Amino acid sequence: MAKKVVAIIKLALEAGKATPAPPVGPALGQRGVNIVMFCKDYNARTADKAGLIIPVEITVYEDKSYTFVLKTPPASVLLAKAAGVQKGSGNPKKTQVGSVTKKQVEEIAQTKLPDLNTRRLESAIRIIEGTAKNMGIGVTD
């Protein structure tokens, strides 16, 4: 018989740098999960993606065991990295903070495709372009 799921916890943590401090500790501690063990597992699986924010979906079972699935980094983080900026524009309609090429947008869309609500690359590219526009990052040819 399958284990009974008690909770599904979603967190966005920096790759390779999960610690028992908030937000990890309180989120997992109240469910009785071994926090240190989760941090070690997460850090081991994300060590190669250092510097990126990696969302994780943790499924906690009745016997206090857990499994977790790593998601792709947020599009805004990937766009900011590609454009070489720290954060998006405070006023994206008037101020552009950087730009990315169509090829970079396509690569980001390819990376994000498993987590987006589309199966087509063309639709994923349009989603990423919309995110770039809302961040004040221009898309050039």
UniProtKB/Swiss-Prot annotation:
One of its GO terms (biological process) is translation. Its main location: plastid. Keywords: Chloroplast, Plastid, Ribonucleoprotein, Ribosomal protein, RNA-binding, rRNA-binding. One of its GO terms (molecular function) is large ribosomal subunit rRNA binding. It comes from the Eukaryota. Signal peptide: none annotated. One of its GO terms (cellular component) is chloroplast. Coiled coil: none annotated. It is found in: Plastid, Chloroplast. InterPro entries: Ribosomal_uL11 (IPR000911), Ribosomal_uL11_bac-typ (IPR006519), Ribosomal_uL11_C (IPR020783), Ribosomal_uL11_C_sf (IPR036769), Ribosomal_uL11_CS (IPR020785), Ribosomal_uL11_N (IPR020784), Ribosomal_uL11_N_sf (IPR036796). The keyword Ribonucleoprotein applies. Part of the ribosomal stalk of the 50S ribosomal subunit. Interacts with L10 and the large rRNA to form the base of the stalk. L10 forms an elongated spine to which L12 dimers bind in a sequential fashion forming a multimeric L10(L12)X complex. Forms part of the ribosomal stalk which helps the ribosome interact with GTP-bound translation factors. Belongs to the universal ribosomal protein uL11 family. This is Large ribosomal subunit protein uL11c. It comes from Guillardia theta (Cryptophyte). The gene is rpl11.
